[in-house]
Amino acid sequence: MIGDLLIFGTLLVNAGAVLNFKLKRKESQGFGDESRAPATGDNIREFLLSLRYFRVFIALWNIFIMFCMIVLFGS
């Protein structure tokens, strides 16, 4: 059970880290757009952009998970 959750979380973070889409903010269309609160899409976009900076740590985490799969979760 815990092994499945670790694999699920690892795959989810990997998918977010390797996205190569151009994630840009929407251009402001008029007056008053600067004062609005960030939307959910903006928050997701910022999170995915921040994941790109942690690719080295994500790679190390993958190696750790592979080690755990062999040593701890293997039969």
From Swiss-Prot:
Alphabetical list of InterPro entries matching this protein: SMIM7
Key words of the record: Membrane, Signal, Transmembrane, Transmembrane helix
Signal peptide limits: 1-17
Taxonomy, superkingdom: Eukaryota
GO cellular component terms, semicolon-separated: membrane
Positions in the Cytoplasmic compartment: 75
UniProt topology in membrane: Single-pass type I membrane protein
PANTHER family, alphabetized: SMALL INTEGRAL MEMBRANE PROTEIN 7
Name the record gives this protein: Small integral membrane protein 7
Organism: Siniperca chuatsi
Gene: smim7
